[in-house]
Amino acid sequence: MTLIDVSNGAKGQSTNFTDPEETPKTIADHVAFARDFLQPFGCDVWKVNMGARPAEGTSADQLKRVADTLNEIGRQTIEMGIRLAPHPHVWGPVEREHEVRAMLDMTDPDYVWFTPDTGQLTLGGLDAVQIMTDYLPRIAEVHLKDTYAKYRGNTETPTREQHAEASVYHNLGGGGVDFPAVMKLLRDQHFKGWVMLDVDGPREGDDGFDAIGGNLDLAVDDYLAHNVNYLRVVLGVKLPPLD
């Protein structure tokens, strides 16, 4: 069996990329996980989140520490044939456009790649198509995720409290992300990496969940059918029939 991709965050694994007291353990934990788990299963892409966002936002020094930590992990994992691909995420230390660009500009492209998540980038105030265009050679894989149209071009990231009240995520076609433009970019540039559907499960307050009367089983089936059909019909992705 070969693993296509794995995320970090295993039990006991440090994911603190900003605290100088914690980053040595973060490096050691990640290198050990790559050596003991990813490499034996032939996994060659490792998507990593970078922990929680500092309470006052991410400072320039903390961004530099994130980049240095990624560089050191990536320097060691590439020797194992594993490409380290950080995943900017709202509520993480790398969230806003200047932070994403700084992370990529301060990391060595021989050691550190990029996992753009279209929904997370949009929620962070970025134009997902533009940032993917600018850093296309660094992209290891792509996560297709959507949000509501009201967050497109937003200047502020929605809070965790807002997300707790009502999910900031949406099925594909919610209007937050220009998916036809995303797919055109990838096709025009002959992107050869993995493109993954990233969907959060239905919950009370979501459009699809409430429309189906709050039946979780039906909502899950409806979510899957909606997103698979969007990929197939709207984006022209060749997929097997949905049974």
Model-derived features: where do they sit?
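Active-site beta-loop-alpha junctions enriched in small/polar residues
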Residues: 6-11, 51-53, 89-91, 117-121, ...
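The substrate-binding groove and active-site-proximal loops of carbohydrate-active enzymes
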Residues: 14-25, 168-174
